[in-house]
A protein has these predicted regions:
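Positively charged n-region of N-terminal signal peptides that target proteins for export
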Residues: 1-4
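Sec-dependent N-terminal signal peptides
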Residues: 6-9
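C-terminal motif of bacterial Sec signal peptides marking the signal peptidase cleavage site
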Residues: 13-16
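C-terminal/domain-edge helix-coil "capping" segments
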Residues: 18-31, 44-58, 98-127
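A broad structural signal for short, well-ordered beta-strand segments within beta-sheet-rich domains
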Residues: 32-35, 84
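Post-signal-peptide N-terminal segment of Sec-exported extracytoplasmic proteins
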Residues: 35-72
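Amphipathic beta-strand/beta-sheet edge segments enriched in Tyr/Trp
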Residues: 79-107
């Protein structure tokens, strides 16, 4: 019985991981450019991400006001009955128009996705 549970747990861990693809490192941002636009986020998730980013000094916008430096888009989001999600996040430097990272996730806990967003944005030079 223990071996079966261990095998199921191991399978879940292998399937639940996400992968990060980075394309290039964006140029350093200045203090006034520490702005991010969130695109296509569910309202409750958007609120939690906004709160975490604001704690780190980011100005967060849900709409296009034209003065953001970074865009984080949430695409192909599908949630299961337990609230775990599948989809991907696309990180774009709006100063150059280039995508600099993509985070694909399967069967991910929203808290882990939220932490990954903060981690990726904080890795930008100057952030």
């Amino acid at each position: 019985m223990k071996k079966i549970l261990l095998a199921i747990l191991l399978l879940f861990i292998l399937v639940a991981c996400g992968n990060l693809e980075t394309y290039h490192t964006p140029s350093a941002i200045k203090k006034g450019q520490k702005t991010v636009r969130l695109v296509d986020f569910p309202i409750d998730f958007e609120g939690r991400v906004t709160k975490d980013l604001e704690k780190k000094g980011w100005d967060v916008y849900a709409g296009n006001t034209g003065n953001q430096a970074i865009e984080v888009g949430l695409y192909n989001l599908k949630l299961d009955i337990l609230g775990y999600g599948t989809g991907y996040l696309k990180f774009t430097d709006l100063r150059t128009g280039k995508e600099f990272a993509r985070y694909k996730f399967r069967m991910a806990d929203p808290d882990n996705v939220q932490k990954e967003i903060v981690k990726i944005l904080e890795s930008i030079p100057g952030a």
